[in-house]
Amino acid sequence: MRFDPPLEEGRLLRRYKRFLADIETASGEPMTIHCANTGSMLNCMSEGCRVWFSRSNDPKRKLPGSWEISETPQGRLACINTARANALVEEALRAGLIAELAGFTALKREVPYGVENSRADFRLDYPSGPVFVEVKSVTLGFDDSDVAAFPDAVTLRGARHLRELAALSRLGVRTVLLYCVNLSGIVAVRAAEDIDPAYAAGLREARAAGVEVLAYGAELSPEGISLVRRLDVLT
């Protein structure tokens, strides 16, 4: 995924009302930009940290700027725009970069499934049958650790997706939970049991039911983001 033009750099003044952030651009101009992240963004930002944002030419947009990348207190880069995760995964799937999911004949997005009115991020069709894939964006890192964690806040939606995947898996359908780790310098992912113990328990139950859990790490820069390597998933 290339940013054209490359992202612009600024400095964070504050994030507020979940979807808004005030920054100072490289030229010293104050600017309010959109923050496409509903999570806590724990350990992703600090007052005065460097941020990178994109601009939209759409005249109908109230806020032309979108916050894309943040420099974390640990000195890492984190893509805080959660909407990028699915696009990154789709790009990698179509390029055959996720070996465990290669060889599909069709890819469909936002496919209804399950009994709790869920939508799978992707359904991949193979001669042997469909595979349902849920994608989660991971940005929570810690001091002196190269292990990231998910989620960064209690996620009822994430727990529901685990239940839905597990139910399908018990019926003999292949299901995959894919962590898209949009945080530099990471080698493994774990459940953030201290933040959401119910999610961690649900993840263990889903794996026991046959849900495959994968993690792929991204390489980030103001010029672009791409998934480049498989990471370990810790139990």
From Swiss-Prot:
- Which CDD domains does the record match to this protein? SfsA-like_bacterial
Q: Which InterPro entries match?
A: SfsA, SfsA_C, SfsA_N
Transmembrane regions? none
Instruction: Please give one Gene Ontology molecular function term for this protein.
Output: DNA binding
Q: Which Pfam families match?
A: SfsA, SfsA_N
Q: Which family does it belong to?
A: Belongs to the SfsA family.
Checking NCBIfam families in the record gives: sfsA
Q: What is this protein called?
A: Sugar fermentation stimulation protein homolog
Q: Which organism is it from?
A: Ectopseudomonas mendocina (strain ymp)
Name of the encoding gene: sfsA
